[in-house]
């Protein structure tokens, strides 16, 4: 199949370019016109500020092949006798329609992520060069051919596709790039916000809290503020705080919060894994969410700001909630292990598993907690897990957590440290003394383990080694005739002669000031001073050339003398 590209801008129909022949340089003479005026300004800004657009580069598709399977009656196919054998049927085969996926095959392709965020700065055109990455491997469809291979002793020929998909391309190693140009007729207003109520739709904001599992006071203060804001929005602010927490924990959202655009409640989820607390909350940007941010700034001292992470940007606005369809207003997820330990499980690295969405949720949460610094970074990289991912993660690795356990300080208290035992101290001290004595034995070395490779420690005394080094240094410099001097001497005799004291006769000579300079080292040029009446000669050494060069007058012509010859008349 020829090479083609496929992409979708926001909610517009999927655009597919015309196929071009394969080569080192493929040129797509393709133009796609999108009417941005038909889109809502808030939706357009949110899309441009969000994750980049994905462009699929299909260069490994094969021609479609018709399935060679012929229709048969029940009982003629050898697999009909194994109809009740459940091992031949996988759960994915019951989810997909076999008649639709029978003649379809997945082919690998390249992915280029194109960002249009620079259009918000007022640019009228963008010349982009985006690297191409390999796509993720999709699970192949399990049809009748796979069931035939599971049956032992059936010599049934393979039907369907005779060729499998091609391997993925090494786009990064080949330095493959996708170059494209984006032109816009009217530049977008730089810095303009879509929070105008005339544009329609309420604006929501998001905030992320990440702090240590041991900070119980911070957890309780944050839960109390969230409870009071939600209770005020639901008309339950007359009850005490502990009663409100129990009511809201048992409160099941029957009506989707997405339909209540002006309901000032904070939705989201709270994840705790025994090491960190993660809060991802969303609400009305100018009401409940701003109140939570101001309360957070007031009851947290500045000295504690660097001990946890808060990702918040009041300029990032969204038209809809991301976690409005969760069962509870604040969904709690209690993992039985930290996220970095869960990501190391081997089940996530097996193909054709049903835990792909759970792995994506864990990877995104781990990236938010440890590798993200701004909310803009989280939004552009599309790190916020969806509500379906959170539900699957809670069902797969979650533990039950009641509201009483959440508000109980004993759950998050540190385990008591064991009291120091005197016998253990003496045993450790005796072991240390045995190691010290083993070092002091002559001609013996000490190692921590004889079964494994480890460092072999040579027994030595630091003070004695330092004295030996100093003595060796003195012997290297001191000789029978004195100290050696480094330099470019031919031998030690010449350097020794230079260090001798001058003879006594030279000391008795009369001292003359600048004798060498006056006789031996006298300069070649005369460096005497000019007299005052001739100082102009010193300054007139270099003169500016005249702007025009005057030509010398041509010499006068010499008169021509005529001589007479004998026998000839004079020449006139």
Curated annotation (Swiss-Prot):
Superkingdom of origin organism: Eukaryota
The protein, known as: Uncharacterized protein FLJ43738
Composition skew (Basic residues), residue ranges: 561-572
Annotated region (Disordered), positions in chain: 553-572
PANTHER family hit by this protein: RIKEN CDNA 1810020O05 GENE, SI:DKEY-57N24.6
């Amino acid at each position: 199949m020829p090479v083609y590209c496929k992409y979708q801008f926001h909610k517009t129909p999927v655009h597919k370019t015309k196929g071009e022949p394969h080569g080192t340089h493929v040129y797509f003479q393709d133009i796609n016109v999108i009417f941005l005026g038909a889109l809502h300004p808030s939706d357009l800004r949110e899309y441009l500020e969000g994750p980049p657009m994905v462009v699929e580069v299909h260069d490994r598709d094969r021609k479609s092949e018709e399935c060679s399977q012929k229709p048969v009656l029940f009982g003629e196919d050898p697999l009909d006798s194994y109809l009740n054998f459940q091992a031949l049927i996988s759960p994915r085969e019951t989810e997909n329609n076999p008649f639709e996926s029978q003649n379809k095959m997945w082919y690998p392709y390249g992915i280029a992520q194109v960002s249009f965020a620079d259009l918000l700065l007022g640019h009228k055109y963008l010349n982009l060069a985006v690297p191409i990455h390999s796509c993720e491997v999709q699970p192949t469809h399990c049809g009748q051919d796979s069931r035939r291979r599971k049956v032992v002793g059936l010599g049934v020929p393979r039907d369907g596709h005779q060729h499998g998909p091609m391997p993925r391309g090494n786009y990064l190693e080949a330095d493959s790039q996708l170059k494209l140009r984006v032109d816009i007729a009217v530049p977008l207003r730089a810095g303009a916000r879509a929070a105008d109520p005339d544009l329609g739709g309420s604006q929501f904001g998001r905030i992320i809290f990440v702090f240590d599992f041991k900070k119980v006071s911070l957890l309780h203060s944050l839960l109390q503020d969230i409870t009071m804001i939600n209770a005020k929005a639901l008309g339950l602010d007359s009850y005490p705080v502990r009663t409100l927490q129990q009511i809201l924990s048992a409160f099941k959202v029957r009506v989707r919060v997405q339909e209540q655009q002006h309901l000032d409640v904070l939705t989201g989820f709270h994840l705790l894994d025994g090491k960190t607390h993660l809060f991802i909350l969303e609400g009305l940007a100018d009401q409940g969410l701003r109140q939570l941010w101001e309360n957070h700034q007031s009851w947290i001292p500045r000295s504690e700001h660097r001990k946890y992470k808060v990702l918040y940007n009041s300029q990032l606005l969204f038209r809809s909630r991301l976690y409005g369809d969760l069962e509870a207003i604040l969904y709690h997820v209690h993992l039985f292990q930290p996220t970095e330990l869960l990501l190391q499980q081997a089940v996530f690295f097996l193909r054709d598993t049903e835990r792909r969405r759970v792995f994506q949720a864990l990877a995104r949460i781990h990236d938010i907690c440890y590798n993200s610094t701004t909310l803009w970074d989280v939004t552009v990289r599309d790190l916020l897990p969806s509500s379906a991912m959170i539900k699957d993660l809670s069902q797969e690795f979650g533990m039950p957590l009641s509201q009483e356990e959440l508000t109980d300080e004993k759950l998050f208290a540190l385990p008591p440290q064991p009291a120091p035992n005197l016998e253990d101290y003496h045993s450790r001290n005796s072991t240390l003394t045995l190691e010290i004595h083993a070092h002091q034995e002559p001609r013996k070395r000490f190692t921590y383990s004889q079964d494994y490779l480890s460092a072999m420690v040579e027994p030595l005394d630091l003070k004695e080694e330092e004295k030996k080094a100093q003595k060796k240094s003195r012997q290297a410099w001191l000789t029978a005739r004195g100290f050696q001097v480094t330099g470019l001497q031919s031998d030690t005799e010449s350097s020794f002669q230079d260090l001798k004291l001058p003879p006594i006769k030279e000391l008795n000579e009369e001292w003359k000031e600048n004798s060498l300079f006056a006789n031996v080292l006298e300069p070649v040029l005369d460096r005497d001073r000019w007299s005052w009446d001739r100082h102009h000669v010193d300054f007139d050494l270099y003169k500016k050339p005249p702007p025009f060069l005057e030509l010398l007058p041509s010499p006068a012509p010499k008169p021509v003398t005529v001589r007479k010859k004998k026998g000839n008349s004079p020449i006139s």
